[in-house]
Amino acid sequence: MKGEEKLWSILNEKLDTLCATNRLPQAIRVAETALEVAKRAFPGAELPLATSFEKLGQLLDQNGDSATAKAYLLKAHAILEKVKPPDQLAIFRSARRLAFLCDNLDRSEEAISFYEKAIAAGTQLEDIPYSDLGTMLNNVALIFRKSGRQKAAEPYYLHALQIYEKQLGPVHADVASVLNNLAVFYTNERRYTEAENVHLRALTIREKLYPPTHPDIAQSKCNLAVVYHSRGDYAKAAEFYRASLKAWEEANEKPSKDYEIVVSNYADLLRSVGEGRKAHQLEVRARKRRSG
């Protein structure tokens, strides 16, 4: 091993020790030195140089300097993309890190690009947790929705559902959660028939897995009530609001934010059909539960 390469290895060992003991300022200084050594020892697009760029970027991000961190992480990623044959795991980790960082910096288009790269690499790897891919797909969908590109969001929800069902089978709590997200998306898009069908699938799964008073069952029933409420089927909406309230109240837990949403929505419905007295009684009952 040449002298510069040996020095680089020694610095990285010291860097690992500093990171393990949470000495961040010292670790950043050592990482900066290791990077300068790597530039001399590994000219060109070599993996050790990418490693040094990435380590310094990660440390700067941990230290709250995300903008500077991004520049180093981008250099690391550019090197990784040139390596032949490509190291898909390294590309996945690098792209995912940049995607989350850009997302946090509100650099939406860059975040989407890196999420796409991470997803593409991750789908080629057998040991990537399905939840990692699902989270990234959901994040891309959220970015599209926030920017008003609703139609672009739907394929990402469907892709996430496909991954979860392939990994877990059709009857699993995580599958129900993905179905719930998709159905809420359809509700927001006023695609009520699709929203109803998908929410019913989620509810069916949850009823197979949980006792009747489980919060997820209460949530599914409330979401279905919102669908019926939104399309003017007040009788069915009231039925599901009551069922959701019953589940929350029989759980004998302190009222949650979700319980308050059900109360508020159902009270609004009651007032809209001239049942103001019942709405008031419902709100009084909810206040008593809050006060305990």
Model regions and ranges:
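Short coil/turn linkers that connect adjacent helices within long alpha-helical scaffolds
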Residues: 1-2, 40-44, 82-86, 124-128, ...
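TPR-adjacent "capping" and linker segments in tetratricopeptide-repeat scaffold/adaptor proteins
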Residues: 1-10
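Amphipathic alpha-helical segments of tetratricopeptide repeats
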Residues: 35-40, 77-82, 119-124, 161-166, ...
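Conserved alpha-helical positions within TPR/SEL1-like repeat arrays
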Residues: 9-20, 47-62, 89-104, 131-146, ...
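TPR/TPR-like (Sel1-like) alpha-helical repeat modules
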Residues: 241-246, 263-291
